[in-house]
Amino acid sequence: MIDLHRAVLGLGLAFALAVAPAEAAASSTIAIIKSDDLDAYDAPIDVFRGRIGRSVEVHTIGGDKAVGERLMAKLAADPPEAVFALGAKAAWLVSHQLPQVPMVHAMVLDPSRYGIDGPAVTGIRMQPPPDLVLAQLQLLAPDVKRLGIVLSTTNNDPMIGEAIQAARNAGYTVIARRVGNERDVRAALRRMPAEVDAVWLLPDPVVVTPRNFQVLQAEALAAHLPVLAYSEGLVQAGALMCVAPDPDAVGRMAADQLLRHFAGENIGVLDRAAPEVVRVVLNRQTQEAIGLTIDPTLLAFVDEVLARPRRR
């Protein structure tokens, strides 16, 4: 596990943890709202609950807008002290229907794309720093020189530009293709093996769909190309590897953002924080299928090796 967190928390946070009145903690309630009933959304909750030091209620909207709106109406009548929202649907509902309630979100791709913003909103970014991600690719697949990226024309996430620049700074030749629709996505993915040594999948709801991933996976396996993904789910589905946020760290960071708010900082001016701790996950079956040899000593830098893709 790679830990980038080298500084202690500020004095304001320490003060909040040490001297917050017991009666305030007992009477305060934090709402955790999950977009759906998924393991990925459950994973940060226990650490968040233990860190925040307040009563916590967990709600799931099950991907159903009507269920979400009923929950918003209930919470509007008796607002929680703050919200930890997991997933874009939950974060969007809270930011639009409970705009006065402080919220930290996580597991959200490109919040600005969905209008998840406001004076009481911050979050934990879904992407680790790109130079950290690329360092792991260089370690495990050092022969890669040309890196392919496919993006939709509507993807304006600032992280994309940061990722491309980081790849160039790391010495990669970047072949980036912008596409406008599903047909163009699949055509670009099919052309990639002739142009690159590896494909870097970045968060993009137009590009990364089940059908498109199947196309990419088939082409990459046939050409013996590594696919660097951004989530453990994609590695389980057949990508070679990912460098993804550690869920315990996400829960801790979300709690710390709210504790800073409770200590007197304005949550709306807190930057969306990059993950401090990441997990490197490798798909052994894919590694063998593409003929990639990895020195066994380097596996010490891998947090989990999947023997075979899991059922999703």
Predicted regions and their residues:
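Short hydrophobic alpha-helices and adjacent helix-cap/hinge residues
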Residues: 3, 11, 24-312
